[in-house]
UniProtKB/Swiss-Prot annotation:
InterPro entries: Anthranilate_Pribosyl_Tfrase, Glycosyl_Trfase_fam3, Glycosyl_Trfase_fam3_N_dom, Glycosyl_Trfase_fam3_N_dom_sf, Nuc_phospho_transferase. The keyword Transmembrane helix does not apply. This is Anthranilate phosphoribosyltransferase. It catalyses: N-(5-phospho-beta-D-ribosyl)anthranilate + diphosphate = 5-phospho-alpha-D-ribose 1-diphosphate + anthranilate. Anthranilate 1 binds at G81, N112. The lineage of its organism: Bacteria, Pseudomonadati, Pseudomonadota, Alphaproteobacteria, Hyphomicrobiales. Transmembrane segments: none annotated. Its cofactor is Mg(2+). Binds 2 magnesium ions per monomer. Pathway: Amino-acid biosynthesis; L-tryptophan biosynthesis; L-tryptophan from chorismate: step 2/5. The gene is trpD. SUPFAM superfamilies: Nucleoside phosphorylase/phosphoribosyltransferase catalytic domain, Nucleoside phosphorylase/phosphoribosyltransferase N-terminal domain.
Length: 339
């Protein structure tokens, strides 16, 4: 039986692991050969020392080798946050996904239940009536027929069951918060990824490049793992094989600045109700932050020339009812009913 202890010792001493060592360590954890104490110790050793790009890439390689894939169009994208930002904000990326799909871009959305917050993507979507435990074929059909499919991480990364209890008991972010956005079961090549801390902007952009992404924006919004309308958003953009960094404020793209308190969410049912309100056309700070993120996603998808153009398309997606129609179709298809 393989042993995680040498890798724990290495990480605890402050020594970085090579990509190969990281993959080996994650293979041990993902195959159920490590105890919860060992998993917790290893994850926290990495967290305290600071995870490296090779360690993240090795961990992703381990996860991808075990995942149940989903078939999606070549131009599909993912819109996802790492979680772990401790903000308790609304489910911005989930709402954004419906708006982007309503604008004509297929979305293969990867997400999980809350691990360090009150309501994760899966919690809110389940509260809306989406069957988050649909199988891979049904999700593929949802993407092709409704424009969006939701892939519940534990269904596609069943090996995660070995580390799930340790993550919940730790109650704080770990390397796994970084891995979710990098382990999309539909192997999308375009991503809008939010991170929980600015030091991860460029490293994750480099990891995405290494993993074959064509276009991606990695964003941090002043305390949020999304683009923000309550402050300045920092972006590391992977475009044409190059990575550039820049900042965006809401005012420069014609959106109102709000206070962080206006973006505070609640439990899953409350967040689901607020999400539905945005798709039904209600004006709010939540709508504005969704418009900003949707505009960026449409730029990443190649559907919009710039952020202002993307925001205009997002407004049209909501106000025409297209985004709401996507939600209704996803609910139907995920529950095996005609769209």
């Amino acid at each position: 039986m393989a042993d995680l202890k040498p890798y724990i010792a290495k990480a605890a001493s402050g020594e970085p692991l090579s990509l190969g060592d990281a993959k080996a360590a994650f293979d041990i954890m993902m195959s159920g050969q490590a105890t919860p104490s060992q998993i917790g110790g290893f994850l926290m050793a990495l967290r305290v020392r600071g995870e490296t790009v090779p360690e993240i890439a090795g961990a992703v390689a381990s996860m991808r080798s075990r995942m149940i894939p989903v078939i999606a169009p070549d131009d599909a994208m993912d819109i996802v946050g790492t979680g772990g930002d401790q903000s308790g904000s609304y489910n911005v990326s989930s709402c954004t996904a419906f708006v982007v799909a309503g604008a004509g871009v297929p979305v293969a959305k990867h997400g999980n239940r809350a691990l360090s917050s009150r309501s994760g993507a899966a919690d809110a979507l389940a509260a809306l009536g989406i069957n988050i435990e649909a199988d891979a074929d049904t999700i593929g059909r949802s993407i092709s027929e409704a424009g969006l499919g939701f892939m519940f991480a534990p269904m596609h990364h069943s090996a995660m069951r070995h580390v799930g209890p340790s993550r919940v008991e730790l109650g704080t972010r770990t390397i796994f918060n970084l891995l979710g956005p990098l382990s999309n079961p539909a192997s999308v090549k375009r991503q809008l990824v939010g991170v929980f801390a600015p030091q991860w902007l460029e490293p994750l952009a480099h990891v995405l490049k290494e993993l074959g992404s064509e276009t991606a924006w990695v964003v941090y919004g002043d305390g949020l793992d999304e683009m923000t309308t309550a402050g300045t958003t920092q972006v590391a953009a992977l475009e044409n094989g190059q990575i550039r960094t820049f900042e965006i404020t809401p005012e420069e793209v014609g959106l109102r600045r709000c206070s962080p308190a206006e973006l505070k969410g609640g439990e899953a049912a409350e967040n689901a109700k607020a999400l539905l309100g945005v798709l039904e056309g209600k004006d709010s700070a939540y709508r504005d932050i969704v418009l900003l993120n949707s505009g960026a996603a449409l730029v990443v998808a190649g559907k919009a020339e710039n952020l202002k153009d993307g925001i205009a398309q997002a407004v049209q997606s909501i106000d025409s009812g297209a985004a709401l129609a996507v939600l209704q179709k996803v609910i139907a298809v995920s529950n095996d009913k005609p769209a």
